[in-house]
């Protein structure tokens, strides 16, 4: 602070005073003013408070079953006191600390989760998420709020579009739902009757349709004639179905359009399916079921635990992020392999470039890092599945009301954890396949490198032998070019003999250079060095 105050005084007294005089040089003046303004605002940009503050996302359920979603700024020094967790546990799940692998810590009244992409603190009625501005955290927040609105906002509402299994409800409630369903169907039938009934009806057509209906009723269970429920009539065309109240008359005919082909005895007693409001459309269901794993247990069951819902969504989003990250690496790897194959098909120089080796090393390092994260997450899930005490301590909502000794069945939590364990196993299998692919590709590159190295060694040997034979011929011809007595100057056949010798020697040199492998085998056989 002492240095910055002196710099500010110096700039305000001297620099700004002389800069303002350069009115003619507008660009220079603006550049200097921008420089001095950045110096003045340096303390605001690099203040210590910005490095120590942490933004947190809080999702809380009140006693009135109201959902509160807020964001808070906390200091790192006050964060353990606000979250009521020790510094050692906070250090393991802090997103700013990249030295720790994914962890799942089970404490007495909370679950601490770090998946590599998400970090959160889960209690029986609230959730704290780190880095709420991250896209994955925003998506997790929206999914949790949507599920909570379905659970608390539309629980028991028949128009909410939620499927309720009847085996989890009491008989009275089941009967009420059946009666309500029949009442709605009956009202729809009477409304269609008022709109579509016509006075002029062909007698022959009416009798044929009535005979078909009598054949169908003989195969189904008898019901009250006053009650009209849509059935699954496979023998009729599904355009028009005619029904009679007491006797088949021309005036008491109902026109029933195609609504839903539902078997009365099977579908009504097994499942009540109600067309919901616009709030639960297909897009919301796809977002909630983000992976192929359907979390129907948490959406449809009566006793829903808030902590399991948050844990399920955070784990699903994190595993999906691992899958996307693995797909991007797989795409880049395929591109590199296809590029190398195209080069080989085009008969280019089959050499390994430095850039290709560096990229393969980067891909291998990324896979190794991803493998470490997935193995750490798998090991944490396996430890929890083996420890019964941790499994019981994860029932935070139940432990808020009863003691831990009364918890005997935790099969629902086992299903949740084993589901995510299976997903991590599948990702680990894909990662191992990619590592094997990279290892195979590296072996091919090594073979390619050895092949090219042998070609260069062979070329070097050919050049050496050709140089040797050519140098011998050059030495012989150079002897005749000197002004020395060789005692064959006066011989008429001297030039002819020397020319034949040099030509034959050149032919021998060309032959051995071309068939250098036989020469190398000869040297190896007699240990010629």
UniProtKB/Swiss-Prot annotation:
The chain crosses the membrane at residues 456-476, 493-513. One of its GO terms (biological process) is magnesium ion transport. Residues 514-529 are mitochondrial matrix. Mitochondrial inner membrane magnesium transporter required for mitochondrial magnesium homeostasis. Involved in the development of the sporozoite in the mosquito vector midgut. GO terms for molecular function: magnesium ion transmembrane transporter activity. Residues 477-492 are mitochondrial intermembrane. Pfam families: MRS2-like. InterPro entries: MRS2-like. It is a multi-pass membrane protein. It is found in: Mitochondrion inner membrane. Residues 336-388, 416-450 form a coiled coil. GO terms for cellular component: mitochondrial inner membrane. Belongs to the CorA metal ion transporter (MIT) (TC 1.A.35) family. Keywords: Coiled coil, Ion transport, Magnesium, Membrane, Mitochondrion, Mitochondrion inner membrane, Transit peptide, Transmembrane, Transmembrane helix, Transport. Possible candidate for an effective malaria vaccine as determined by epitope response in sera. It comes from Plasmodium falciparum (isolate 3D7). It comes from the Eukaryota. This is Mitochondrial inner membrane magnesium transporter MIT1.
């Amino acid at each position: 602070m002492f240095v910055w105050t002196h710099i500010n005084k110096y700039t305000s007294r001297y620099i700004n005073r002389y800069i303002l005089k350069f009115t003619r040089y507008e660009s220079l003046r603006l550049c200097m003013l921008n420089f001095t303004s950045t110096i003045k605002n340096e303390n605001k940009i690099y203040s210590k408070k910005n490095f120590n503050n942490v933004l947190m996302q809080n999702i809380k359920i009140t006693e009135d079953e109201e959902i509160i979603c807020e964001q808070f700024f906390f200091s790192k020094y006050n964060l353990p006191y606000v979250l009521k967790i020790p510094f050692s546990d906070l250090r393991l799940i802090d997103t700013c600390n990249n030295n720790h692998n994914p962890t799942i810590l089970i404490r007495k009244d909370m679950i601490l989760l770090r998946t590599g992409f998400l970090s959160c603190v889960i209690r029986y009625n609230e959730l704290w998420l780190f880095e709420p501005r991250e896209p994955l955290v925003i998506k997790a927040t929206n999914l949790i709020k949507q599920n909570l609105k379905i659970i608390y906002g539309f629980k028991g509402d028949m128009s909410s579009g939620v499927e309720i299994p009847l085996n989890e409800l009491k008989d009275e409630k089941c009967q009420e739902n059946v009666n309500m369903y029949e009442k709605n169907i009956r009202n729809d039938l009477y409304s269609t009757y008022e709109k579509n009934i016509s006075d002029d009806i062909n007698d022959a057509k009416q009798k044929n349709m009535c005979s078909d209906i009598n054949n169908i009723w003989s195969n189904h269970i008898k019901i009250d004639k006053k009650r009209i429920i849509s059935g699954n009539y496979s023998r009729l065309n599904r355009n028009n179905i005619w029904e009679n109240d007491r006797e088949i008359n021309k005036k008491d005919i109902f026109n029933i359009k195609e609504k839903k082909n539902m078997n009365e005895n099977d579908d009504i007693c097994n499942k009540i399916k109600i067309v919901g409001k616009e709030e639960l459309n297909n897009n919301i269901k796809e977002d909630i079921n983000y992976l192929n794993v359907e979390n129907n247990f948490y959406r449809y069951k009566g006793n829903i635990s808030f902590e399991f819902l948050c844990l399920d969504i955070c784990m699903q989003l994190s595993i999906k992020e691992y899958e996307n990250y693995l797909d991007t690496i797989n795409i880049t790897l395929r591109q590199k392999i296809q590029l190398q194959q195209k080069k080989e098909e085009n008969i280019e120089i089959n050499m390994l470039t430095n850039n290709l080796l560096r990229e393969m090393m980067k891909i291998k390092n990324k896979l190794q890092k991803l493998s470490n994260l997935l193995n750490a997450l798998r090991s944490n899930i396996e430890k929890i599945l083996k420890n019964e005490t941790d499994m019981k301590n994860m029932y935070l909502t139940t432990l808020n009301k009863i003691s831990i000794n009364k918890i005997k069945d935790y099969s629902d939590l086992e299903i949740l954890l084993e589901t995510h364990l299976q997903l991590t196993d599948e990702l680990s299998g894909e990662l191992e396949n990619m590592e094997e692919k990279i290892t195979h590709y590296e072996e091919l590159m090594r073979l390619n490198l050895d092949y090219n190295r042998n070609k260069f060694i062979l070329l070097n040997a050919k050049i050496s032998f050709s140089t040797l034979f050519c140098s011998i011929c050059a030495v012989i011809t150079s002897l005749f070019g000197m002004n020395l007595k060789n005692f064959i100057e006066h011989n008429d056949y001297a030039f002819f003999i020397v020319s034949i010798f040099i030509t034959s020697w050149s032919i021998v040199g060309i032959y051995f250079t071309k068939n250098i492998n036989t020469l190398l085998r000869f040297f190896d056989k007699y240990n010629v060095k």
